[in-house]
UniProtKB/Swiss-Prot annotation:
Top-level division of the source organism's lineage: Eukaryota
Name of the featured protein: Integrin-binding sialoprotein
Domain writeup: The Arg-Gly-Asp (RGD) sequence serves as an integrin-binding motif and is required for integrin-mediated cell attachment.
Source organism per UniProt: Homo sapiens
Entry PTM: N-glycosylated; glycans consist of sialylated and core-fucosylated bi-, tri- and tetraantennary chains. O-glycosylated at eight sites; mucin-type glycans contain Gal, GlcNAc, GalNAc and terminal NeuAc.
InterPro entries in the record: IBSP
Entry's localization field: Secreted
Role according to the record: Binds tightly to hydroxyapatite. Appears to form an integral part of the mineralized matrix. Probably important to cell-matrix interaction. Promotes adhesion and migration of various cells via the alpha-V/beta-3 integrin receptor (ITGAV:ITGB3).
Main location per the UniProt record: secreted
Gene, per the UniProt record: IBSP
Length: 317
């Protein structure tokens, strides 16, 4: 019994002494000086970048607080419940207002191009992953309606293009005779109908004038590049206007010699001697050009940093 008590007392003293040293070391390490000069990371894993920030975000750690883990799980469950409730609400609203839903679903993230069918599984991803694929028959009906509306729009556009082309042909036939397109439109009533606006008539007249110029130039000889103007005023090739206080150089000549006085010449014309003279006559500072710099500092090329005048600096202190 005595030996057992003695051993227990010795063991308790050793444990108390070791714990005392541990607490003392922790307090010393928490000081500001040791935090700056003696940085020893408390946890070995924090030395590595891929373990930092704190490990409570990762499920690998087994010693994290159970309350935090339970909190994360509960938050995930709440999010799932919210998603399911949103899905239920969307289903109810879809049953009540089908027309409004049809308008909203067409505003999807990826709009369909012309001629593409909306499949019931992949079409209408307007509310990403929340909206469920439902009522394939309604979706196909919507797709057929869209097709019909697109075909009607195309037919209207083709009809308008045909009318414009016919009007341009009539204007070209009358413009070749020398009469102006505006007068023919006013007299004969071609071009713009009674229901069209005045702006459309003006645009058609401009296109007709351009067509007149092209037809007249095509009738002339192919060797001549000169354009003749139409009797109604046409277009003449003009040279671009000169900028104020500038003189254009003659054709085929450069501006380096004759027009040198107009520009400020900032190059090194006086001191540019091809980097061949070490000490120039013009008082150029040493080291200003590369050749002089290389000649001046090539003395130190073969020597190490510790060699001065053939002596080792650290061995002669």
């Amino acid at each position: 019994m005595k030996t057992a008590l003695i051993l227990l007392s010795i063991l308790g003293m050793a444990c108390a002494f070791s714990m005392k040293n541990l607490h003392r070391r922790v307090k010393i390490e928490d000081s500001e000086e040791n935090g700056v000069f003696k940085y020893r990371p408390r946890y070995y894993l924090y030395k590595h970048a891929y373990f930092y920030p704190h490990l409570k975000r990762f499920p690998v750690q087994g010693s994290s607080d159970s309350s935090e883990e339970n909190g994360d799980d509960s938050s995930e469950e709440e999010e799932e419940e919210e998603e399911t409730s949103n899905e239920g609400e969307n289903n109810e609203e879809s049953n009540e207002d089908e027309d409004s839903e049809a308008e909203n679903t067409t505003l999807s993230a990826t709009t369909l191009g012309y001629g593409e069918d909306a499949t019931p599984g992949t079409g209408y991803t307007g509310l990403a992953a929340i909206q469920l694929p439902k009522k394939a028959g309604d979706i196909t009906n919507k797709a057929t309606k869209e097709k019909e509306s697109d075909e009607e729009e195309e037919e209207e556009e083709e009809g308008n293009e045909n009318e414009e082309s016919e009007a341009e042909v009539d204007e070209n036939e009358q413009g070749i005779n020398g009469t102006s397109t505006n007068s023919t439109e006013a007299e004969n009533g071609n071009g713009s109908s009674g229901g069209d606006n005045g702006e459309e008539g003006e645009e058609e007249s401009v296109t007709g004038a351009n067509a007149e110029d092209t037809t007249e130039t095509g009738r002339q000889g192919k060797g001549t590049s000169k354009t003749t103007t139409s009797p109604n005023g046409g277009f003449e090739p003009t040279t671009p206007p000169q900028v104020y206080r500038t003189t254009s150089p003659p054709f085929g000549k450069t501006t380096t010699v004759e027009y040198e006085g107009e520009y400020e010449y900032t190059g090194a014309n006086e001191y540019d001697n091809g980097y061949e003279i070490y000490e120039s006559e013009n008082g150029e500072p040493r080291g200003d050009n590369y050749r002089a710099y290389e000649d001046e500092y090539s003395y130190f090329k073969g020597q190490g940093y510790d060699g001065y005048d053939g002596q080792n600096y650290y061995h002669h202190q």
